[in-house]
Regions:
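Structured-RNA-binding interfaces characteristic of tRNA pseudouridine synthases
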Residues: 1-254
């Protein structure tokens, strides 16, 4: 049985996230159906992370097992003939048997886009969060700096989610403006549910003056979700980089 890793990208507007669900269309389900049509048997896709409804991926990795002998260099073309235009497979490679798209991933980068202008741009609808009040990206960066390091991130996760530990390590959080578009790039060894979006909302709250940006450090220490900023809309969030190192497969995409 071959273990195949796919690299893909998708626009998440039409999908209810990655995870396969019975009553709604998801990216994972759509990819599984396309792969089954190509290899001639049902497949199970393991994705590199749970992206929510409306979230996009400039890069995404999934793996599946197959008995089909189709060469990896032909797989992207074959899969794309069965996929809608908003999901594209860009690469396929055979990996070792223990490779797992989520378990072998050691770092991820998400980018959140804010369209910060007094007039909305229709080309950014569901692709960036329209925010008409001017934001000072230097204040946002001061708040973002407080997230860097190893912390308990319970204050920026969705309440009611159950995980073994809420401690994560953030390697960098960079906020940049280019014209009216503000990008927030954050890299960590893992993300809690809605963590990236809540971190973005907290940086926005700091720029609004709801609390000094340096207070974010204390908000993390207190672990109070209500003290942090809101969970911003999903349409501005993109998975943008992935790092893999499980001792056998070492690579990064994005």
């Amino acid at each position: 049985m071959r273990n195949i890793a796919l690299t893909l990208k998708y626009l998440g507007i039409a999908y209810h996230g990655w995870l396969v669900q019975k009553t709604v269309t998801t990216v994972g389900q759509t990819l599984e159906e396309a792969a089954a049509a190509v290899v001639g048997h049902p497949v199970h896709m393991t994705g590199c992370g749970r992206t929510d409804a409306g979230v996009h991926a400039r890069v995404y990795v999934a793996n599946f097992r197959t008995t089909a002998r189709i060469p990896c260099d032909r797989l992207p073309y074959a899969l794309n003939t069965h996929l809608p235009e908003d999901i594209v497979v860009t690469n396929a490679m055979e990996v070792h048997d223990d490779f797992n798209a989520i378990g072998s991933c050691v770092r991820k980068e998400y980018t959140y886009l804010i369209y910060n202008s007094g007039i909305r741009d229709p080309f950014y609808v569901n692709r960036a969060w329209f925010y008409p009040k001017h934001l000072d990206e230097t204040v946002m960066q001061r708040a973002a700096d407080c997230f860097v390091g190893t912390h308990d991130f319970a204050a920026v996760r969705s309440v009611g989610t159950d995980v073994k530990s809420t401690v994560r390590t953030v390697y960098y959080y960079k906020i940049e403006r280019e014209g009216d578009l503000i990008s927030l790039r954050v890299c960590a060894n893992g993300f809690l549910y809605n963590m990236a979006r809540a971190m973005a909302g907290t940086c926005v709250y700091a720029a609004e003056g709801k609390f000094p940006p340096e207070d974010v450090a204390q908000i993390l220490l207190n672990g109070d979700r209500t003290a942090a900023g809101p969970t911003v809309p999903p349409g501005g969030l993109y998975m943008t980089k992935l790092w893999y190192d499980d001792g056998k497969a070492v690579f990064h995409v994005g």
